[in-house]
Amino acid sequence: MTDYTFPVIIGVIFGMTARLYMLRTDYRQYPTYIHGQVIHIALGFIASGLGAIIMPALIQEEFTAITFLTLAATQFRDVRNMERNTLTQMDSYELVSRGSTYIEGIAIAFESRNYIAILTALITTTACIFFSLVVGTVVGILCFFMAKLLMSGSQLKDIVNIQKGELRFDGAGLYVNDIYIMNIGLPEKQKLILEHGMGFILTPKNFNSATTIANLGQRQAILFDLSNVLGVYRDSGEPSLCPLAKRDLNNGTLGVFILPQWQREDLAVRVLEEVPILENAIRMPTDFIKKKVR
């Protein structure tokens, strides 16, 4: 064994630990089956191994070994494409789809998590080499918590206030409070909607929030998460029984209409609160306005 054996092993362990933690699945994530997880565990091991050998390779002046990082970057970009293509194909068979914005966010997350595994292994191994195995272990633990912090993005409750809305019909028009949702002409469908439907009002906390929830991809993510947890009272070929989110053009308030199988208002509010804010949906118009005012 060389002087770098234990530092590399510790780096790989912490890189893999970080990747395994970031692989945890819930109701909105993919992969949810063991075969999909095996692919990402294997790629996480490769990423951790690459990160762990970077510093020993530099010290030994084995600069050729560093070129493998370019191959790794190409491979991890393929992971992003694989996730995007897989989820896009799966999405066409969902009763309530994720939407392309949500899918792109998941694909980006899976690519970036491999890079986090590389950085975790690199930093841990470097600390082990230049200080000690104990210091390297402490640094690895800190990197693990940093990875945990990077996973915790903004949630819907951070940008809106959520309250229950009243479903009502004005003629053939379906409303959540005063926000128009869609036109339902058949009396039997109106009865089904009033019986099984639920409505919520999302009031943005500021102008940036109003612009963010106006994004169609963010709205679709809200509907998908609600339908995924609470179920959906519809089948294919039922356009009138389709969950929708519509906007009040005057103040940016969002009216959300869903048809859950499980009539749990408290659970629906909790799901709404934890809907992730999609990176591609975030808008900061006030930052531009402030710069112009100056």
Q: Predicted regions span which residues?
A:
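A cytosolic-side transmembrane-helix exit/cap motif
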Residues: 82-95, 153-165
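Short membrane-interface loop/juxtamembrane segments of multi-pass integral membrane proteins
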Residues: 91-109
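Alpha-helical transmembrane segments and their membrane-interface exit regions
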Residues: 16-21, 69-81, 140-151
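Alpha-helical transmembrane segments and their membrane-interface junctions
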Residues: 62, 66, 117-137
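Select subsegments of transmembrane alpha-helices in polytopic membrane proteins
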Residues: 38-43, 105-118
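Membrane-anchoring hydrophobic segments
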Residues: 1-61
